[in-house]
Amino acid sequence: MKIWIKRILLSIAALLALSTAVLGFLSSRPGADELRGSVEINKPSADVWAFLEEPEKLKSWVGWMKEIREATPGSRGVGSRQVWVMEDMNNGGALMEINGEVIAYRPGRSKTVRINVPGVFTGETEYSVEDLGGGRSRFSQNSKYAFANSFTKLLTPIIMPSASKKGKEDMQRLKNKVEAQ
């Protein structure tokens, strides 16, 4: 094999190894697998809470949401389960089913949902609504994820900024929907 071909192949291998090392380092940083965000809404907290509890209202502000299936119809507290069917626009519009189970619940204030997509990720998301007085409230969402395989874990520095952007868009949509009613 000609020497220049060997050099090109070695350079490509070195770039791949370096890229993998950088992604590995970035994905292992504290907080790399977490998302946090909040938005102030010029409506009372009860109005915001309805957009977390009522499936049609929830679908109206969570982007990519196509369907919500109640696994425990009528139940909203600890142990209630839903399946969110999402059209993942970062994956060519493929449908993804996210299983969720409420593991902590304070009506009108907060709920924590354990979520999973088998073979892809698991996580927990806390949704909270804080009364700021004067008919204003703050909605917050804090999530932590664990990816199911090494390749996906390696892509954390690419996946999480995209998820963060979507989360911010969703929160702005929530603000607009609640304030418009």
What are these regions (language model features)?
Residues 45, 49-55, 62-65, 79, ...:
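Extracytoplasmic/secreted envelope proteins and their assembly/folding machinery
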Residues 3-22, 138, 144-181:
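A conserved amphipathic terminal alpha-helix motif
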Residues 41, 45, 51, 92-96, ...:
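Solvent-exposed, acidic/flexible segments
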Residues 4-72:
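Hydrophobic ligand-binding cavity/cleft-lining segments
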Residues 30, 132-134:
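Surface-exposed coil/turn segments at beta-strand junctions on protein surfaces, enriched
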Residues 52, 141-142:
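Short, well-ordered beta-strand segments in beta-rich or mixed alpha/beta enzyme
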Residues 5, 9-12, 40, 70-119, ...:
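Glycine-rich portal/gate segments that line the openings of hydrophobic small-molecule binding cavities
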